Amino acid sequence: MLKLNNLALCALALLPIALTAQTPVTSAAQTQTANGHRADEAAIEQVMKQYHAAILAHDGTTLSGLFLPDANLWLNVLTDSAYARAQVKSPTARKVRVSNYQDFAKLVSTTPKSFDPEHSNLVMHTDGTIAVVYFDFVFNIDGKANNRGSETWQLVKTTDSWHVASTIYSSEPPV
């Protein structure tokens, strides 16, 4: 005969409840639409399109205009494997690199190379005042993947439009 302790008996007693309890799952877009923020979501998607177009056009001025002017947080965080490779090349390599959107806009404006970022698996959350956007990316230079990872933007809605306040991304350059 099988003997069960009190913990096992409690777990068995709760099993039917656990198996029948269902939590509704909604996508970010469904949640936002239900909360009345569909127009904000569309405006944020427009910021992403403008970002992409500015990079393709080497337009650092337009790119800079998408960011909150006083915001400077731009973090590039190497993945563990990328950091290990970087340390082999330079023992003083940094895992977290701090920069700002102005430096990126300057690079976009001055490089003769062709930049083309690809974004996928977009997840967006907003309350109509602040927002976070999370996506996977591949950053192509002259048609070749130069970097990949995940990226998050924190955005704020000012009196006139949505602006990126900070950018944080993981970085896995090709080997």
Where is each model-derived feature located?
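Extracytoplasmic
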Residues: 58, 68, 117-119, 128, ...
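Short, low-complexity N-terminal intrinsically disordered segments enriched in polar/charged residues
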Residues: 22-69
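Surface-exposed, charged secondary-structure patches
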Residues: 87-144
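A short gly/proline-enriched turn/hairpin at secondary-structure junctions
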Residues: 73-94
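A mature extracytoplasmic/lumenal domain signature
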Residues: 67-69, 77-79, 135-139, 168
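Short beta-strand edge/turn micro-motifs at domain boundaries
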Residues: 24, 132, 146-175
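Bacterial N-terminal signal peptides
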Residues: 9-20
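Bacterial N-terminal signal peptides that target proteins for export
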Residues: 1-11
